[in-house]
A protein has these predicted regions:
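Conserved DEDDh/DEDDy metal-dependent 3′-5′ exonuclease domain
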Residues: 1-82
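Flanking scaffold residues of small Cys/His-coordinated metal-binding clusters
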Residues: 144-147, 172-173
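Cys/His-rich microdomains that often coordinate metals
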Residues: 154-158, 182-185
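Short metal-binding segments enriched for Cys and/or His
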Residues: 174-200
Length: 201
């Protein structure tokens, strides 16, 4: 926001910019994005008469953390400390928020840097969690590689786990590990390899 936009509470420009990013995206990564961020943005899109953005998938790091790990807290800040990844910048407390409402340029600049830091933190946390996400987006679908590709991260650097199989009620499948994100995958062909891998659930 510019100082003038902050003072007049005019958020239309940044809502239009956000809509454009959503409309271009294939995948959005967010922490609590499914329950909060996406719906919050949708409300603003509706307010300004914008249509629903074109289809995209959401990878929610909060959902991954809740499903896979018995940690005392699941906030982005806690996960950053727990995983020893770069922590987002301090927003400066309530004074920064008050300054933003008053159109103070320094406060607005601080908030921009804080949010950029948030993105860096989220990116690093997602890198650490994506190998655990068995209900997530199939990244292999966005990859033109004809080799066996990891569904979690899109890497074709996968290795067979010798003598290890995944079983369904009627079949067994060769198991692989992605050397990029650590995900465990299986072939989609009975007792054999294949160029298409699926998640082991």
């Amino acid at each position: 926001l510019t100082p003038k936009e902050a003072l007049t509470k005019d958020d239309e420009r940044i809502v239009l910019e956000a809509w454009s990013l959503f409309d271009q995206a294939d995948i959005i990564v967010a922490h609590n994005g499914k329950r909060f961020d996406v719906n919050k943005c949708n409300g603003y899109f509706l307010k300004y008469g914008l249509p629903k953005p074109s289809p995209f998938k959401v990878i929610d790091t909060l959902e991954i953390a809740k499903k896979n790990f018995n940690l005392p807290f699941k906030s982005l800040e806690y996960l950053a400390k727990f995983l020893d990844v770069e922590l987002k910048l301090d927003a400066g407390g309530i004074e920064t928020w008050i300054g933003c409402e008053r159109g103070d340029q320094e406060a607005l600049d601080t908030m921009v840097e804080y949010n950029r830091g948030d993105i860096i933190t989220l990116r690093e946390i997602h890198k650490r969690l994506k190998g655990w996400d068995n209900n997530g987006v199939n990244i292999a679908l966005y990859n033109d590689n004809h080799n066996a590709v990891c569904t979690h991260c899109g890497s074709d650097n996968v290795s067979v786990l010798s003598d290890k199989f995944a079983y369904t009620p009627n079949r067994k499948y060769q198991v692989y590990r992605c050397n990029g994100c650590g995900a465990v995958l299986r072939s989609n062909r009975k007792e054999g390899s294949g160029n298409s891998l699926v998640r082991v659930v």
